[in-house]
């Protein structure tokens, strides 16, 4: 016989489950967007909640930037709506900025509606006029009242980390990379509730990217971003939102989790497609044997047949860019640099630099922003002169130089017209040639897209 255990008096601790309340910042409800006959996406829906750090992934040309523009309020969907929580602040880092080129960096930073920034600006202006004690006292009291001291320290740190040290520089005099970093600094300094980012790591060197990763890790900020930097995505984002074949898929994890689960999803889809094809074959045989006079039961089965047919004939549109380059025979001499010097004012880029490029080498150039990487490329491609030394190019060598600025494109041109300006045909390996249209197809521009205007 098992005796009943004796109960001892003591303390009872009640464990309560912590309730996590999801605070929705923004909801995308059944939005669609098309340009002419080209449908980017149709009836897609998703939400962005507080503290989520979401990466939005999709194939090129499927409308990632269009979606960012829509949720940022810069563009309207053809149908559906975007509903945002009342009172939240939203900031958007677009690929192209609209900063006033006549302002200085400092003026640009303070030309926002941020109240704390306005107070910091007032305080810093007061410091420049020490004789006006009343203005200084008023500014000091506001800094105390709004506890703006930490804010001042942080905004200066952000500018420093992004190498925006000379605040007197005019925006119009900045390089493309500096303007991008200034745009990033502005959205970070303003501390929005929801931050939308389009390629945030463009024009950032490794040190800046690592700092930005750490910044997002410690800051309580909600992110929705598009980036091709998979390592940045892996370290920053805690959720992946994918637009694939017109459908939205959610993955609650980082990029590695997404890759693993997407592979499993595609494998399951392939299995289901195989089953659908087998069932379609069976039902097709039944359809062919059926008499014209149908019963109610057979009519129902016939209706199901057409649904099965549609499912069995689904195909994934997986395209990959395939490149072939016609390489002409090279001589023994490729490119040589001998005792090359290059400076911009007091800043030395190259100081007696020597290097002999060998056939088949694949050389990467790394360095912090502003150290002269682009200048070095301009020197070896002979688009910029050297101060001293020699750059010797082999007689059979031809350059292909893709710059950050790309090529000049007129927006009123069609895509196919831009390519044809460089040639109607493109030489490939083994003496083969393809047309400009075929080249564009290899870069995922189908026949319809080729006749779209560049501005679209």
Across the structure, where does each feature detected by a protein language model lie?
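A short, surface-exposed helix-loop junction/capping segment
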Residues: 133-142, 281-289, 318
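ABC ATP-binding cassette signature C-motif
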Residues: 9, 14-273, 323-456
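Intracellular alpha-helical coupling/juxtamembrane segments of multi-pass membrane proteins
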Residues: 261-294, 298-304, 308-315
């Amino acid at each position: 016989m098992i005796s009943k255990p004796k109960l001892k008096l003591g303390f009872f601790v009640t464990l309560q489950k912590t309730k996590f309340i999801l605070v929705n910042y923004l909801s995308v409800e059944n939005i669609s967007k098309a340009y002419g006959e080209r449908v980017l996406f149709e009836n897609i829906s998703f939400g962005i909640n507080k503290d989520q750090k979401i990466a939005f992934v999709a194939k090129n040309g499927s409308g990632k930037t269009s979606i960012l523009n829509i949720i940022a309020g810069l563009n309207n969907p053809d149908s559906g709506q975007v509903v945002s929580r009342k009172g939240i602040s939203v900031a958007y880092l677009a690929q192209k900025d609209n900063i006033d080129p006549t302002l200085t960096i400092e003026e640009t930073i303070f030309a926002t509606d941020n109240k704390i920034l306005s107070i910091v600006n007032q305080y810093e202006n007061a410091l420049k006029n020490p004789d006006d004690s009343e203005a200084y006292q008023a500014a000091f009291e506001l800094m105390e009242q709004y506890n703006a001291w930490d804010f001042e320290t942080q905004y200066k740190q952000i500018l420093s980390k992004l190498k925006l040290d000379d605040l007197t520089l005019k925006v119009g005099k900045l390089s493309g990379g500096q303007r991008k970093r200034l745009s990033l600094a502005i959205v970070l300094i303003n501390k929005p509730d929801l931050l939308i980012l389009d390629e945030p790591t463009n024009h950032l060197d490794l040190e800046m990217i690592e700092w930005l990763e750490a910044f997002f890790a410690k800051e309580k900020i909600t992110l929705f971003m598009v980036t091709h930097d998979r390592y940045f995505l892996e370290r920053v984002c805690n959720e992946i939102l994918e637009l694939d074949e017109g459908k939205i898929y959610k993955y609650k994890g980082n990029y590695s989790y997404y890759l693993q689960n997407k592979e499993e999803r595609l494998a399951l889809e392939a299995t289901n497609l195989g089953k659908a094809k087998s069932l379609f074959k069976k039902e097709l045989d039944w359809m062919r044997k059926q008499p014209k006079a149908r019963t109610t039961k057979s009519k129902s089965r016939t209706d199901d047949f057409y649904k099965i047919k549609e499912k069995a004939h689904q195909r994934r549109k997986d395209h990959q860019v395939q490149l072939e380059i016609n390489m002409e025979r090279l001589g023994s001499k490729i490119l040589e640099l001998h005792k090359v010097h290059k400076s911009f004012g007091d800043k030395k880029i190259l100081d007696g630099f020597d290097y002999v490029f060998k056939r088949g080498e694949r050389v990467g150039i790394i360095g912090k922003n502003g150290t002269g990487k682009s200048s070095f490329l301009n020197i070896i491609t002979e688009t910029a002169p050297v101060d001293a030394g020699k750059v010797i190019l082999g007689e059979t060598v031809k350059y292909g130089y893709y710059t950050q600025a790309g090529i000049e494109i007129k927006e009123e041109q069609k895509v196919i017209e831009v390519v044809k300006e460089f040639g109607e045909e493109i030489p490939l390996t083994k003496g083969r040639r393809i047309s400009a249209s075929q080249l564009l197809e290899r870069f995922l521009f189908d026949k319809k897209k080729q006749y779209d205007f560049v501005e679209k």
